[in-house]
Amino acid sequence: MDMDTRTRCGIIIACIALLTGYCIVDGIKAQVPSERRESVSFRTMGTVAAVTFYDPGDGVLQKGCETVKAEFEKIIRIANLYDSGSELAQLNRTAYQKEFFCSELLWQMILEAEYAFHFSGGAFDITVKPLMDLWGFYRKRGEAPNENEIKEALNKVGFHKIVLDKKKRSIRFTVPGMGIDLGGIAKGLALDLAAQKSAGLIERGVLDLGGNLKFLGGKKSYLVGIKNPSAPDRLSDKTFHAPPGSSVSTSGDYERKVIYGGKVYGHIIDPVSGYPERGKYSATVCCRSAMRADWLSTAVFLRGKKLAEKAEKEMNPCHIILVEK
């Protein structure tokens, strides 16, 4: 959809959101019938994004969309694994031979990933790339990997196997063949950056990046519904109110997948076992930082209620909902 294609987003947001994990309803819209919502959607970072503003002035939505796209592009140039010229691709090629000096934004993601690794007990680990390669999530293979292949890949996985120099903002791999995948953290940072830049344009709005949501300003909360993980084309009976300024992310095993021998494998790989996790539920996280919500939903999907309880206790404000299959 191009920039001139606008719509009252009551329908478009619901449709896009249903595809990506959410249905957003303004909890008190019925009491404020004059409130107007406009939205524009576009493809970026391998998914669909949508920018929604409430009661925007003339030209504000277009300017806001351009602002959001510019922030997303910053992260794409850094974290795109499919672009050999991206900063992350350069890091993965050279960090075993010599230390790699990171840009400020890449370093920000790596430090958050370090915290995530320790907080989750290794459930979230950006060094999972060798396993993602092995299981065919970048380039499909003919059959599922065997146990020996998984063990070999696991030797290259583990955040504790990289060396960070926080004074020089550098990183070095200690094992050949290691690689970083920022897929579980980059979209969150992109949303945080876009929200910061959008703050002066609009009082109230929603940014949606492939189902990762950031709610902008205002005083009203947003009613969020969550997909049924057993029937992803329908919503579950779980809803919650997300406050202004908060972020929401859901992880489940019903999105990206590969099929080997008639068996379906979801894209969320446990970096400890080396196998894709068949979750009992989906995990939805609501907290202030979109980057934190991004990785935490993945970690909670893998580790379940115990980690969810820890996060709610130690990351307040943080709200987590598990929807069982």
Task: Describe the role of every protein-language-model region.
Residues 2-325:
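Mature catalytic core of soluble alpha/beta enzymes
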